[in-house]
Amino acid sequence: MGDFDGEQKELIKKLVNFRMIDGKRTRVRAIVYKTFHRLARTERDVIKLMVDAVDNIKPICEVVKVGVAGTIYDVPGIVARDRQQTLAIRWILGAAFKRRISYRISLEKCSFAEILDAYRKRGISRKRRENLHGLASTNRSFAHFRWW
Protein backbone atom coordinates (compact mmCIF):
# COMPACT_ATOMS: atom_id res chain seq x y z
CA MET A 1 0.00 0.00 0.00
CA GLY A 2 2.15 2.76 -1.38
CA ASP A 3 1.72 6.44 -0.67
CA PHE A 4 -1.80 6.58 0.79
CA ASP A 5 -2.82 8.57 3.82
CA GLY A 6 -4.15 6.91 6.97
CA GLU A 7 -7.82 7.10 6.06
CA GLN A 8 -7.26 5.55 2.63
CA LYS A 9 -5.16 2.72 4.08
CA GLU A 10 -7.89 2.08 6.63
CA LEU A 11 -10.51 1.93 3.87
CA ILE A 12 -8.51 -0.63 1.87
CA LYS A 13 -7.87 -2.67 5.01
CA LYS A 14 -11.60 -2.68 5.83
CA LEU A 15 -12.42 -3.72 2.27
CA VAL A 16 -10.07 -6.69 2.53
CA ASN A 17 -11.16 -7.69 6.03
CA PHE A 18 -14.90 -7.54 5.31
CA ARG A 19 -14.54 -9.65 2.20
CA MET A 20 -12.20 -12.22 3.78
CA ILE A 21 -13.56 -15.74 4.23
CA ASP A 22 -11.71 -18.43 6.20
CA GLY A 23 -8.68 -16.17 6.70
CA LYS A 24 -7.57 -16.21 3.05
CA ARG A 25 -6.24 -12.68 3.03
CA THR A 26 -3.88 -12.91 0.06
CA ARG A 27 -6.63 -14.27 -2.16
CA VAL A 28 -9.00 -11.49 -1.13
CA ARG A 29 -6.31 -8.83 -1.52
CA ALA A 30 -5.74 -10.06 -5.08
CA ILE A 31 -9.48 -9.73 -5.80
CA VAL A 32 -9.52 -6.19 -4.37
CA TYR A 33 -6.51 -5.14 -6.43
CA LYS A 34 -8.00 -6.68 -9.59
CA THR A 35 -11.11 -4.62 -8.91
CA PHE A 36 -8.93 -1.52 -8.50
CA HIS A 37 -7.20 -2.27 -11.83
CA ARG A 38 -10.61 -2.47 -13.53
CA LEU A 39 -11.55 0.85 -11.93
CA ALA A 40 -8.25 2.37 -13.09
CA ARG A 41 -9.30 1.80 -16.70
CA THR A 42 -12.31 4.09 -16.24
CA GLU A 43 -11.00 6.64 -13.74
CA ARG A 44 -7.58 8.11 -12.93
CA ASP A 45 -7.65 8.17 -9.14
CA VAL A 46 -9.04 4.84 -7.96
CA ILE A 47 -8.76 5.53 -4.24
CA LYS A 48 -10.59 8.84 -4.59
CA LEU A 49 -13.30 7.07 -6.58
CA MET A 50 -13.59 4.43 -3.84
CA VAL A 51 -13.75 7.05 -1.09
CA ASP A 52 -16.44 8.98 -3.00
CA ALA A 53 -18.42 5.78 -3.59
CA VAL A 54 -18.36 4.97 0.13
CA ASP A 55 -19.33 8.56 0.96
CA ASN A 56 -22.33 8.29 -1.37
CA ILE A 57 -23.54 5.14 0.41
CA LYS A 58 -22.91 6.21 4.02
CA PRO A 59 -26.19 6.37 5.97
CA ILE A 60 -26.81 9.45 8.10
CA CYS A 61 -29.45 7.91 10.34
CA GLU A 62 -30.62 4.42 11.22
CA VAL A 63 -33.40 2.81 13.22
CA VAL A 64 -33.02 0.74 16.37
CA LYS A 65 -35.75 -1.47 17.78
CA VAL A 66 -36.68 -0.36 21.30
CA GLY A 67 -39.27 -2.08 23.47
CA VAL A 68 -41.44 0.24 25.57
CA ALA A 69 -44.32 -1.08 27.70
CA GLY A 70 -44.63 -4.29 25.69
CA THR A 71 -44.55 -2.56 22.30
CA ILE A 72 -41.56 -2.52 19.98
CA TYR A 73 -40.82 0.74 18.15
CA ASP A 74 -38.36 1.53 15.39
CA VAL A 75 -36.54 4.51 16.88
CA PRO A 76 -34.42 6.64 14.52
CA GLY A 77 -30.97 7.78 15.58
CA ILE A 78 -27.79 9.31 14.22
CA VAL A 79 -25.05 6.95 13.01
CA ALA A 80 -21.45 7.38 14.22
CA ARG A 81 -18.78 8.04 11.56
CA ASP A 82 -17.02 4.70 11.92
CA ARG A 83 -20.32 2.84 11.72
CA GLN A 84 -21.30 4.87 8.62
CA GLN A 85 -18.19 3.71 6.80
CA THR A 86 -18.60 0.14 8.05
CA LEU A 87 -22.21 -0.05 6.89
CA ALA A 88 -21.36 1.48 3.51
CA ILE A 89 -18.57 -1.01 2.83
CA ARG A 90 -20.70 -3.90 4.06
CA TRP A 91 -23.59 -2.87 1.80
CA ILE A 92 -21.37 -2.44 -1.26
CA LEU A 93 -19.78 -5.87 -0.76
CA GLY A 94 -23.16 -7.47 -0.03
CA ALA A 95 -24.58 -6.02 -3.24
CA ALA A 96 -21.55 -7.33 -5.17
CA PHE A 97 -22.09 -10.82 -3.75
CA LYS A 98 -25.78 -10.60 -4.65
CA ARG A 99 -24.88 -9.64 -8.22
CA ARG A 100 -22.42 -12.51 -8.38
CA ILE A 101 -25.11 -15.01 -7.45
CA SER A 102 -27.64 -13.48 -9.85
CA TYR A 103 -25.47 -13.05 -12.94
CA ARG A 104 -22.82 -15.77 -12.45
CA ILE A 105 -19.84 -13.52 -13.18
CA SER A 106 -16.59 -13.01 -11.30
CA LEU A 107 -16.46 -11.15 -8.02
CA GLU A 108 -14.04 -8.57 -9.45
CA LYS A 109 -16.55 -7.60 -12.15
CA CYS A 110 -19.41 -7.46 -9.65
CA SER A 111 -17.40 -5.33 -7.23
CA PHE A 112 -16.31 -3.07 -10.06
CA ALA A 113 -19.91 -2.58 -11.21
CA GLU A 114 -21.25 -1.94 -7.70
CA ILE A 115 -18.49 0.55 -6.82
CA LEU A 116 -19.14 2.45 -10.05
CA ASP A 117 -22.88 2.42 -9.33
CA ALA A 118 -22.23 3.70 -5.81
CA TYR A 119 -20.01 6.45 -7.22
CA ARG A 120 -22.82 7.44 -9.61
CA LYS A 121 -25.40 7.30 -6.76
CA ARG A 122 -27.20 4.27 -8.16
CA GLY A 123 -27.29 0.55 -7.48
CA ILE A 124 -28.44 -1.88 -4.84
CA SER A 125 -26.44 -0.38 -1.97
CA ARG A 126 -27.73 3.14 -2.69
CA LYS A 127 -31.29 1.83 -2.73
CA ARG A 128 -30.66 0.20 0.65
CA ARG A 129 -29.47 3.54 2.04
CA GLU A 130 -32.56 5.31 0.70
CA ASN A 131 -34.83 2.65 2.21
CA LEU A 132 -33.16 3.09 5.61
CA HIS A 133 -33.52 6.87 5.47
CA GLY A 134 -37.17 6.49 4.47
CA LEU A 135 -37.80 4.16 7.41
CA ALA A 136 -36.11 6.60 9.77
CA SER A 137 -38.15 9.54 8.49
CA THR A 138 -41.36 7.49 8.73
CA ASN A 139 -40.64 6.66 12.37
CA ARG A 140 -39.32 10.06 13.43
CA SER A 141 -42.34 10.49 15.71
CA PHE A 142 -40.78 7.84 17.96
CA ALA A 143 -37.49 9.74 18.33
CA HIS A 144 -38.39 10.71 21.90
CA PHE A 145 -37.81 7.06 22.88
CA ARG A 146 -34.11 7.49 22.12
CA TRP A 147 -32.36 7.34 25.47
CA TRP A 148 -29.32 5.19 24.81
From Swiss-Prot:
Gene Ontology molecular function, alphabetical: rRNA binding; structural constituent of ribosome
Cystine pairs: none
Subcellular location: Mitochondrion
Keyword Mitochondrion: yes
InterPro entries per the UniProt record, alphabetical: Ribosomal_uS7, Ribosomal_uS7_bac/org-type, Ribosomal_uS7_dom, Ribosomal_uS7_dom_sf, RPS7_plant
Single GO cellular component term: mitochondrial small ribosomal subunit
Family that this chain belongs to: Belongs to the universal ribosomal protein uS7 family.
Role: One of the primary rRNA binding proteins, it binds directly to 18S rRNA where it nucleates assembly of the head domain of the small subunit.
Known partners and oligomeric status: Part of the small ribosomal subunit.
This protein's name: Small ribosomal subunit protein uS7m
The species this protein was found in: Triticum aestivum
